[in-house]
């Protein structure tokens, strides 16, 4: 295939991997048709993104952004800056993403007005440094 197809396939594959990891395997694959309509494969059925909760949509967008960053930066590690992006996440979703970010061993800056992120980092025993501005 052409370069666009190759990049698209790699992006879809990595997005699917990340989404599967942060959802505990609940969503195994991100699918996209020619009209760029997205759906996910649960392993049992295909679900259109219109039928997913806002929290799950946010997980898909997170996985897509992380996959795009990896694709464009190649083997170079890149810092991740997240500015109040977890508002629609419940505690389980947020804990899964925080653990995934820790596992990736890259610099992560989380800007938030909530204490929940710190509480969940503490609960999961993920080391961090807090800075109050």
Task: Give residue ranges: language-model regions.
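Charged, surface-exposed helical/loop "interaction arms" that form contiguous linear patches used
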Residues: 1-23
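Conserved ABC ATPase signature
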Residues: 2-10, 38-65, 85-91
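A short, noncatalytic alpha-helical element within ATPase nucleotide-binding/catalytic domains
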Residues: 16, 61, 95-99
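ABC transporter NBD signature
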Residues: 19, 53-55, 73
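Long, charged, glycine-rich C-terminal linkers/tails
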Residues: 24-43, 48, 78-81
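Short basic/glycine-enriched coil/helix segment immediately N-terminal to the Walker B
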Residues: 70-79
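Conserved ATPase-coupling elements of RecA-like P-loop NTPase cores
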Residues: 73, 88-95
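C-terminal lobe/lid and adjacent interdomain/linker elements of RecA-like ASCE P-loop ATPase modules
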Residues: 92-133
